[in-house]
Amino acid sequence: MQTIPDALFGIIGYPVSHSVSPAMQNAAFKHCKLNYLYLTIAAKPEDLQNVIASMRPLNIRGLNVTIPHKIEVIKYIDTLDPAAKKIGAVNTIVNENGQMKGYNTDFGGFVRLLEHNRIAPAKHRFALLGAGGSAHAISLAICTLGGHLTVLARQEEKAKDLAAKMCLRFKGKAQGLELNEANLEETLAESDIIVNCTPIGMGNLAGQSLISPRLLRPDLTVIDAIYNPCKTRLLEDAEKKGAKIINGLEMLVWQGAMSFEIWTSQKAPFRVMMKEAEMALDENEK
């Protein structure tokens, strides 16, 4: 017999049906004997304000925030954790007695991914594709740890704005360029790590890549923040060229574990969450 959950949580984004977050968070709740439920909430940009407002009457205890809402959502929450304020993007919300507080765990998730793969940013030059919410957190992680960063985005102004924010804190460590073939070719020739923070390669954009295979080479490390599919077109092309490839699943689970700890004040069962996320991803790809 099912019981009514003591608290509701969820992930808001568009699209969001591909997410493995419900599987891993619900597994974590069960492991920790918490009678909580985590749901997916598909919300187009025009519906974002209403969904956040509904957290109060529906007593939704917390949310994860994903593409494309991580920056826009800041308008609709009451307070920001200092890290989220510094990053300028939110991926975790807590409903504290009707007050919405925003956090960012993408930063920590990416740092853990770098540590696990023994990547010391200070020794590398990064090409970062995209200038959205995840890119804000990842760019700050790269620059904080001493890496040199080039941000490439289709809207040149967004790339330059993000790079300028990094340069205010880390002089000379970042530049922003329009994402086009010429700039990609020049930037990748000088970079040894590529990070894709765009949705190109997932959902309706699966099978697509922003980078021509001819620009890839064996000495590159290619990181795709996308985890579903497990291997995007970019990662497949990079692997064929002999490059090291890393998908976004590990980062997802680390940031999800940090969100769990913010919501529950309990230590997250990381291994349980990783196993469940891998199983859910395998099921999604069948």
Curated annotation (Swiss-Prot):
Keywords: Amino-acid biosynthesis, Aromatic amino acid biosynthesis, NADP, Oxidoreductase. GO terms for molecular function: NADP binding; shikimate 3-dehydrogenase (NADP+) activity. NADP(+) binds at G130, A131, G132, G133, S134, A225, G248. Shikimate binds at S19, V20, S21, T66, N91, D106, Y227. The active site is at K70 (proton acceptor). Involved in the biosynthesis of the chorismate, which leads to the biosynthesis of aromatic amino acids. Catalyzes the reversible NADPH linked reduction of 3-dehydroshikimate (DHSA) to yield shikimate (SA). PANTHER family: BIFUNCTIONAL 3-DEHYDROQUINATE DEHYDRATASE_SHIKIMATE DEHYDROGENASE, CHLOROPLASTIC, SHIKIMATE DEHYDROGENASE. This is Shikimate dehydrogenase (NADP(+)).
